[in-house]
């Protein structure tokens, strides 16, 4: 397992991994397997780490988007997210007697949206940034998965 955290991923391998992770996340969500989200998160971190290695950056930087999302969740809960989550649960169970402040709801959604936009931007940046030519401190350059003649 630890070998997944080492080495480099080129842009081609990165985008294939991103596509597979998105499909896996949708499939697991459709199957109501939310518990598998931790595994998907770990795979995102591994994908980001290997791509960061290709551009000469340390892998720990991949933890920043996850930390940002965690902070956004904590801010949301601190600002009244518990009633917000209770209201969502009530709506799912068709109990519409629980009301929350619109301002709190918009604030929580806004904080989460900022975190998601940052993760999206980070993912795109890693996918378009050129990797280091030749070997770097993380190993030799990655080979292309699909060879072009």
Each predicted region: which residue ranges?
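Membrane-helix interface segments in multi-pass membrane proteins
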Residues: 24-41, 68-119
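Central hydrophobic cores of alpha-helical transmembrane segments
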Residues: 17, 61-70
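Membrane-interface extramembranous regions at the lipid-water interface
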Residues: 1-25, 40-60, 122-149
